[in-house]
Amino acid sequence: MSTHPQIDQQVTFLYTHNLNASTEFYEQKLGLELWLDQGTCRIYTVSGSGYLGLCQASEKSTPPTDKQSSVIFTLVTQQVDEWFEYLKERDIEFEKSPTLNEKYNIYHCFFRDPDGYLIEIQRFETNDKKKDITK
């Protein structure tokens, strides 16, 4: 197995039709902290070295217009139920309440952002410390 050069950070970029609405959703509803404002693209700290970039769509870049997007933005936490209650208090409508997925051994829930991107709050249900990426 070869060793690759170090990766310092990771950013997932999502296009939005309305940067102001997405900014309000991710800042006010999810409570993410703005890390870098580039005008038409805003980058938020998710955790440690993980970031989310929201970019205003241009005529050449089209975000999904329906709920069939293949992107899932997953936030991993031990506190799935706490996040569920926190977001319900902020009037977030869930597509799926917290449930155990036995196939993948995860506990999770789903909702969508203003552009229709699917967001998952998830906990790995494993006793194997090696696989528990939240610790």
Language model segments and positions:
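A generic local structural motif
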Residues: 1, 30, 59-62, 96
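N-terminal beta-strand motif that seeds the catalytic metal site of vicinal oxygen chelate
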Residues: 1-23, 71-73, 125-135
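Short secondary-structure junctions
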Residues: 31-37, 94-97
